[in-house]
Amino acid sequence: MSIDLHLEQNPTVSDLTDLDAIAQDWQQWFQVWLTHLQKDANYEIALRLTDDDEIQKLNAQYRHQDRPTDVLAFAALEADIPELPPGLAGSENEPIYLGDIVISSNTAVVQAQERGHSHQYELVWLAAHGLLHLLGWDHPDEPSLERMLEQQDILLSLIDIREFTSDTVKPQASEK
């Protein structure tokens, strides 16, 4: 199993996170998560860190909600991944393109402060949430949201995000 992870960052949020410094970590985390969730295929995912303006435009265009949000996931496949037909198993040379995850780094900063953890932890939490959406998870009601949040906790327990140092997460202007 392998993962091709394409990382992008809107230049307006480049002062919030040094994406180049943690790109290898992101690659490893998605590899661990997908190995746990989906063992027998190769995958491709795009992850974009952006600002509230860009995510608000996407949210308005695709979800008809004209406001910023924390994370959007654009699944490339209609089927739930656990039920993929055998022909879509993803060979060594042909990864299955799961889709795009877009995270508002601005909203992640606010939520991290509200929840009492680091900006980086919030980004990883949101990435795990987005990945679950790409794999067919949804939360139309409270019980399904609870199941999804439990799965996010499991995914985060599989990686050691505590290894971050202050040089991989850039301080906010108010923290300088």
Language model regions located:
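An acidic/histidine-cluster motif and surrounding catalytic segment
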Residues: 1-124, 135-176
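Conserved ATP-binding N-box helix of the HATPase_c
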Residues: 132
